[in-house]
Amino acid sequence: MAVVLDLLNNDTRPKVEAPARPRHPEKAHRPDTAIQRKPDWIRVKAPGSKLWAETKDIVRANNLVTVCEEAGCPNIGECWEKRHATFMIMGDTCTRACAFCNVRTGLPESLDAAEPEKVADAVAKLGLHHVVVTSVDRDDLKDGGAEHFSRTIAAIRRASPGTTVEILTPDFLRKPGALEVVVAAKPDVFNHNLETVPGKYVTVRPGARYFHSVRLLQRVKELDPTIFTKSGIMVGLGEERNEVVQLMDDLRSAEVDFLTIGQYLQPTRKHHEVVRFVPPDEFKAYETTAYAKGFLLVSATPLTRSSHHAGEDFARLKAARLAKLGPAPVAVNA
């Protein structure tokens, strides 16, 4: 063994770099699908302003991950120009393999114990009045990352007491007690996306369970009715209108306050194809239907994303609840 190591150490042959690990190894076997040309109503301005660069520098300096970059969000230029960024905690590698998502998949690294403080520091430096924190799925962790969420919320509260906190969580499937840990940290908004209608889960979101996600949102309200709840879906995946309307009913039965609906955009040829681009007038019709069903707030446009305009939407949420329901209810320990 020593001889082999000596030979390797003295080897002067040119080093051959190992091939980069594919971003989505589980999708390698999938046939390529054509990426359709986007219609005019989905075009966005390319990022590159001074404020955008400043936001990027703060994110890099704190060695943070943002879902804006990892998911290829089309609104990154607009949001970062306003110094808004959605922080993605617990690494850049997800343990799920959803057919729509551009986030890297595989076996994640260990948690960074300093990450909550790094996020809090970036929030303070950016001067955020409202921050959105999301994460990859961490099925490898006993609590799914619930304690890490809790610590991040607490760190932000310490560093920026006036900042409201919105979280976008995974489903904590088969992680008993995890949700209770996160809710106890008292985020101002608890967001968990259904992503699509139940009939599409097998092909679009195979690692999740639709009614588990609905129940998760319902349980948040049972644990603390003062927390706003929010969920979002993508359209253009082949769903029917009646399926979307039924999904609205399911969310209202769980007392969800805020619904977002946006156009699905295909990240690569290996991802789920865009079945169609839904025109703006159909988004408007979805918005009208959702408001009629009792949602406090609805955002339904082709470029709507969960965190887009989150700060402004939080102010609108508070105003809508006050106008419709009166002062916020008092939390009851469950």
From Swiss-Prot:
It comes from Methylorubrum populi (strain ATCC BAA-705 / NCIMB 13946 / BJ001) (Methylobacterium populi). The keyword Metal-binding applies. This is Lipoyl synthase. Binds 2 [4Fe-4S] clusters per subunit. One cluster is coordinated with 3 cysteines and an exchangeable S-adenosyl-L-methionine. Its cofactor is [4Fe-4S] cluster. Keywords: 4Fe-4S, Cytoplasm, Iron, Iron-sulfur, Metal-binding, S-adenosyl-L-methionine, Transferase. CDD domains: Radical_SAM. Gene3D superfamilies: Aldolase class I. InterPro entries: Aldolase_TIM (IPR013785), Elp3/MiaA/NifB-like_rSAM (IPR006638), LIAS_N (IPR031691), Lipoyl_synth (IPR003698), rSAM (IPR007197). [4Fe-4S] cluster 2 binds at C94, C98, C101. It catalyses: [[Fe-S] cluster scaffold protein carrying a second [4Fe-4S](2+) cluster] + N(6)-octanoyl-L-lysyl-[protein] + 2 oxidized [2Fe-2S]-[ferredoxin] + 2 S-adenosyl-L-methionine + 4 H(+) = [[Fe-S] cluster scaffold protein] + N(6)-[(R)-dihydrolipoyl]-L-lysyl-[protein] + 4 Fe(3+) + 2 hydrogen sulfide + 2 5'-deoxyadenosine + 2 L-methionine + 2 reduced [2Fe-2S]-[ferredoxin]. Its main location: cytoplasm. Residues 12-33 have a biased composition (Basic and acidic residues). Pathway: Protein modification; protein lipoylation via endogenous pathway; protein N(6)-(lipoyl)lysine from octanoyl-[acyl-carrier-protein]: step 2/2. GO terms for cellular component: cytoplasm. Its EC number is 2.8.1.8. NCBIfam families: lipA, PRK05481.1, PRK12928.1. The gene is lipA. The keyword Transmembrane does not apply. It is found in: Cytoplasm.
